[in-house]
Amino acid sequence: MRNVRGTTAASQRMGTLGQRPDRTASHRRLITDGGVDESDDEGDADDAESDDAGREEMAAVPIGVKLGSTRTVVSLPDSRGAGDEIIRTLTCLATYEDALTGEERVLYGEEAASEYPDRVQFLLRSGLPEDEDRAALCEKFFSTLIEENDLPAYSAVVYAIPTIDNPAGIENLKSVIEGSDIGGRLVESYPESLCGAIPAFGDDLEAIDEIFLAVNMGSTNLEASAYRRGEQLAPFTTGAVTGNEVDRMIANNVEEETQGRVNIDEQTAREYKETHADFDAFEPFTDVIQQPGGGSHEFTIERSVMDACEDYLDEAVEEVANTFLPELANDHMKVYQLALDRPVVLTGGMACIPGIVDEFEERLGAALQRDVEVITADQPDLAPTIGAKRIAERLVDDD
């Protein structure tokens, strides 16, 4: 059985990636080489040896995966092997009955959300599968995604996992990973914020040799951790400051700004945020809704989106400056001092908002009364998956 371990509130350490990983370290390889069970049948043994020999000649495909609460992202080599092929979809599914055969059919991602809004299910609203039923649905979603995108079974897969102290949820995620048809060579998991920091530091794995702070601005949690040469220290998580809460605030703000004439759902609010939020140059925008009984109503949004984003950023800075950093200083004073002299990395979907990096830098510096530098990858929402794929590439090379 595959031994899949997620990140919890305990410290995680990955081996030095320039060397073969230490399998006794606290963060270890999660699956051994893709072999078969022993059998007394000589024919089966011969087939297994032939299989293994064939696999030795075939290079395992490195794959990075992030099963996110809003979106799932997969990164693998493109057809030329020179860049990344990115598969990005909403982490949701809907089932329906085939009109001809009566069989159950599955739609996932944007297609499910748009065609079956009344029955679509987002599977990881808390960041992990909440129970066995949700894990089974998540497994169905993931297997459908794998099949439709023809992801290779003989692959080395690294999962970017959120830092959540939820053993039951980690076990449910383990069942999803174990049930998938990829990862025949190896499967491993690393903290999402570490994976997301890798593209921010350069084109290789420079982040693994750094001491730095990472803040993951996700849909369901705000996470912060220190990293010392790949070792995760003082992981902090709160569900009080989230991208999902921003969506709810935008929906409420729109109702208030339009004096109750317009009500939008959270999906529409998220689209407003992703399309229009901008700390550098926000511009008011108009939208149109159909009114009951016929006719339409055009309205303009001036404050609703950015008021919610401003509140989010203030709360995120407060959590980092007044909760996470004091805890880090108390437990690891030297790392605290060294890390603040190095860049703070923002990851996660909220880090995609234009101008948020500079605003976070200014507000965190003011809160700490010192200069800080804040950076992010070019595409913060894709960065954890790209970083995970780079780790997978190194692990394959080291084997």
What would you call each of these model-derived segments?
Residues 170-180, 357-365:
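Short, aromatic/basic amphipathic alpha-helical patches
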Residues 1-58:
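Haloarchaeal acidic low-complexity proteome signature biased toward cell-envelope/secretome components but also
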Residues 16, 22, 56-61, 67-169, ...:
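Conserved phosphate-binding loops in N-terminal lobes of ATP-dependent enzymes
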Residues 55-83, 205-232:
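Gly/Thr-rich phosphate-binding beta-strand-loop-beta motif of the actin/hexokinase/Hsp70
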Residues 179-263:
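Small-residue (GG/TT-enriched) beta-loop-alpha framework at ligand/catalytic clefts
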